Amino acid sequence: MAIQYNYGTGRRKSAVARVFIKSGTGVITVNHKPADEYFSRETGRMIIRQPLELTGNSTNLDIMVNIRGGGESGQAGAVRHGITRALIDYDETLKSVLSKAGFVTRDAREVERKKVGFRKARRRKQFSKR
């Protein structure tokens, strides 16, 4: 018999996380590494555990994540979004709790493009009066 996985896709900035959850002992693996090894900063580790701690599923679900693109902060946000969607697929009653915490909503902020004649997206070239 096949193992029953629940799936969720999470996105943040340019990072995309594919999250698979199944009943287990609370092991989180990100790109075939333990989450504590993959995310070097404590804030990243804290962000990915937020939806699990909120719903009380931090010790009874195994999570496998494949992630591509972005930096460490964007990847952590994408994993959180993916875990949230997978938890909703796992148990529909958790949706109200997770949406009140703001985890269901996709953070749509992206990097603004650089404009022609500017140094950065909004930073203009230095003006010289003389």
Curated annotation (Swiss-Prot):
Biological-process GO terms, alphabetical: translation
UniProt xrefs under PROSITE patterns: RIBOSOMAL_S9 (PS00360)
Keyword Ribosomal protein: yes
Residue runs in coiled coils: none
Record bears the keyword Ribosomal protein: yes
The entry's keywords: Ribonucleoprotein, Ribosomal protein
Family: Belongs to the universal ribosomal protein uS9 family.
Protein name in the entry: Small ribosomal subunit protein uS9
Organism: Nitrosomonas eutropha (strain DSM 101675 / C91 / Nm57)
Lineage: Bacteria, Pseudomonadati, Pseudomonadota, Betaproteobacteria, Nitrosomonadales
UniProt gene name: rpsI
